[in-house]
Curated annotation (Swiss-Prot):
Keyword Ribosomal protein listed: no
Annotated family: Belongs to the ViaA family.
HAMAP family: ViaA (MF_01626)
SMART domains: VWA
Oligomer and partners: Homodimer. Interacts with RavA.
GO cellular component: cytosol
Protein name, as recorded: Regulatory protein ViaA
Subcellular location: Cytoplasm
């Protein structure tokens, strides 16, 4: 079949001018003018998309087939161009019949041209073909304009949908022209309004927690390298205060909250035998909130130890991608869940602004991943925000997934961020050793975002930096009071 693009070439119809006219008409539409005025940072991203629009229109012209009637008329015209005047006169009745058959706009004019001239001269032959070609050019141009107008309407509809989406998410995710451009690129997917409202919802929550946004920016833009002990470094004296509780019964000095089973109050011990309160007992045991006797004799003393001399390097480090692990255990539900999701959204904003990748992994009984800065990043973010935190805590699997990803070529300079309350089992020795190897040999940095003041120190000791955001009621009230 004859395509419209081929017909344009045959008749020397200037399709580039028609395409440019469509693009300029689209840019001059009132909708785009109002959008550019409201969101000036996205204007450059939209104008950078113009080559893609032009390519789309060219591709549409190449793929569109010419109607069968016009194809038949064009083939007849091409055959007539090769005929001499006597041969053309012989074929003229069949030509006029074909023009009537295909309902050509030139049919009436052709018959009039023949009937008005008794003698068919070579000049009349040339005039007949010239006017026929002009009719074909008009038909082709009209077909081009009709097709491009349909494409313009479709393109305008697509752009309006993307403008609506981008306008809604601009305040949440756009920090500079880099992020504006990437947001516009990601808006090309088929996203429903009700879906992306979830991002707007967590963006509003993030706006109510400015400390969380500030924490994400500090973590995302921290370039300071960690202290690394040099090989064969000299030892230095290191003094720490160590608390040593009394190990023998002494005089009771009062009550305190701790996890000392040997000094429990009888009332606390009684709850262990009640099925309905057993879970509450273990929770308070983990959080060191059980009421116990406080004995005299507990004291602090100075412990002296030796450690290698370390040198703190303050050179700026290159910014690599984020690998963010989010704890989805039951203890991370409620307000913790909101904070964790909003924090990931804030890291996505930083990653878009700095042209970095941001990969989210949820860990409970299994590990699920979402790349928020990919081409389908908005859909990935919506899926992530739709998850519910109701699983268990398998932080070891989380670290193994991080280690495996860091060993890939695309993530060689990644920063790992673990968001959790860190109320979990201790890490296996092989995982700890592998993490320390990555920190020491490849300068990978591991960040902890602690959502609780009761995280296990043994787990958190492995991180280069601990960013604390206590979600307890007291801390929330203090933060609100300070604003």
């Amino acid at each position: 079949m004859l395509t419209l693009d081929t017909l344009n070439v045959m008749l020397a119809v200037g399709e580039e001018g028609l395409i440019e006219e469509v693009v300029l008409t689209l840019l001059a539409s009132p909708q785009l003018a109002a959008f550019f005025e409201k969101f000036p940072r996205i204007k450059k991203a939209v104008t950078d998309d113009l080559p893609r629009w032009r390519d789309s229109l060219r591709r549409r012209l190449k793929e569109t087939e010419v109607p069968p009637e016009l194809t038949e008329e064009v083939e007849c015209y091409q055959q007539c161009q090769r005929l001499s005047t006597p041969q053309f006169m012989v074929q003229l009745p069949q030509i006029l019949t074909l023009l009537d058959k295909v309902h050509s706009p030139y049919a009436a004019q052709a018959r009039k041209l023949v009937t008005d001239n008794a003698t068919f001269t070579p000049a009349l032959h040339t005039l007949f073909l010239q006017r026929w070609r002009l009719s074909l050019v008009v038909q082709t141009t009209s077909l081009n304009q009709q097709l491009l107008e349909e494409e313009r309407e479709q393109l305008l509809s697509e752009v309006q949908e993307r403008m609506t989406l981008t306008g809604q998410l601009e305040q949440v995710l756009v920090e500079n022209e880099n992020s504006a451009g990437r947001l516009w690129d990601m808006s090309a997917g088929q996203i429903k309004r009700g879906d992306y409202q979830l991002i707007v919802k967590y963006g509003d929550f993030l706006a109510q927690q400015p400390e969380l946004m500030q924490l994400a920016e500090q973590l995302g833009r921290s370039r300071e390298a960690k202290s690394v002990p040099k090989k064969d470094a000299p030892m230095e004296t290191f003094r720490t205060l160590v608390r040593e509780p009394a190990t023998v019964p002494e005089q009771v000095d009062g009550l305190q909250q701790s996890d000392d089973i040997l000094r429990l109050l009888p009332t606390e011990l009684a709850t262990l035998g009640i099925t309905e309160l057993e879970y509450e007992f273990y929770r308070r045991l983990v959080e060191k909130q059980l009421l116990t006797y406080r004995l005299q004799g507990e004291s602090w003393h100075e412990k002296i130890s030796q450690r290698p001399v370390v040198h703190q390097d303050f050179d700026e480090q290159p910014r690599g991608p984020f690998i963010v692990c989010v704890d989805t255990s039951g203890s991370m539900g409620g307000f913790n869940e909101q904070c964790a999701k909003a924090f990931c959204l804030a890291l996505m904003r930083v990653a878009l602004a700095d042209r970095r990748r941001c990969f989210i992994m949820l860990f409970s009984s299994e590990v699920v991943g979402y790349e928020l800065t990919a081409e389908q990043g908005i859909e990935q973010a919506i899926r992530f925000l739709s998850q519910r935190f109701r699983g268990g805590t398998d932080i070891a699997s989380c670290f193994r997934s991080i280690i495996e990803r860091m060993q890939g070529g695309d993530w060689y300079d990644a920063d790992a961020v673990v968001i959790s309350d860190f109320i979990a089992q201790r890490l296996p020795d092989d995982v700890v050793a592998k993490v320390k190897s990555l920190q020491r040999d490849q300068q990978h940095r591991f960040h902890a975002v602690a959502m609780s003041a009761h995280g296990k120190p043994g787990i958190m000791r492995i991180f280069d930096h601990i960013w604390r955001f206590d979600t307890g009621l007291r801390s929330r009230l203090i933060r609100r009071w300070k604003r």
